[in-house]
Amino acid sequence: MKNNIVIITGITASGKSELCDNLIEKYGNISIINCDSKQVYEEIPIITAQPPKQEVFYKLYGYVSAKENYSVGLWLEDLEKEVNHALENAQIPIITGGSGLYISSLIKGLSSMPQISQKVRKNVSELRKNLSKEEFYKLALSKDPRIQGKVFMNDSHRLSRALEVITETGKSIFVWQENRQPPLFNNFKIYTILPKREDVYRKINSRFITMIENGAIDEVKKLLSMNLAPHLPAMKAHGVPEIIKYLKGEITLDEAIQIAQTNTRHYAKRQYTWFKKQFLNAEVIDCANKLKIF
């Protein structure tokens, strides 16, 4: 291959994992490397749809404690080791996942983002909890007008991050993002899977029910038993906040399932818009089965 590093990305539930399974069956000289910010956590393999641990072809899955505030910078360090190891062993590295920040940092270089104090993080978290979505959005917009048209009301995670940065530093998050380090690699080919939304939404709904049946509730019980801070990334994985509310008796299980499905569909919708605009050099396909890599 001219480009000896492959990136397979796309929205959640687009078929990335199934495609990688098929590639493993068909070829023996590949290494599948995770690019999903929640699939790194050891305690939540079911609710984050991680591949089986015994699968030797898969790297950077389920190897970080949920106690850790794992970052894109740490992931890039781990990724570099795995990619170089694969290349040294005549394997083709296939980096796959849907975390936009991870992929953007890999392709464009890591932004020099500031450290956020626990005080600011806690204050923003309280605001996010106590304000309505509209109120929280208006607050963030009043502090950082540059988010208009770039960060939207339903994207509470990115709104929180923007508010944290402007509060901590007095500078817009977009000012920080403009200052990037050089990318780790430039010899890659990127594929983006963007299926029909209706198909993705159906898969999201059925997949979450399967996760519940396979033990997702027990995973969340374990997280609660660890007394983790609510701002930690593992506590924000899709489905975790909704199951926590169910376990605390605030909502029924049916309500938790419905809310988690709805929130994940909204996330997929935002991903769809983001991926269409971000990687103009990517080969875009609407079905994982149509992807021809080799």
Swiss-Prot record:
SUPFAM superfamilies named in the record: P-loop containing nucleoside triphosphate hydrolases
Catalytic activity of the protein: adenosine(37) in tRNA + dimethylallyl diphosphate = N(6)-dimethylallyladenosine(37) in tRNA + diphosphate
Swiss-Prot/TrEMBL keywords: ATP-binding, Magnesium, Nucleotide-binding, Transferase, tRNA processing
EC number(s) reported in the record: 2.5.1.75
Family matches, as Pfam families: IPPT
Molecular function GO terms recorded: ATP binding; tRNA dimethylallyltransferase activity
Family (UniProt): Belongs to the IPP transferase family.
Function: Catalyzes the transfer of a dimethylallyl group onto the adenine at position 37 in tRNAs that read codons beginning with uridine, leading to the formation of N6-(dimethylallyl)adenosine (i(6)A).
Listed name of the protein: tRNA dimethylallyltransferase
Gene behind this protein: miaA
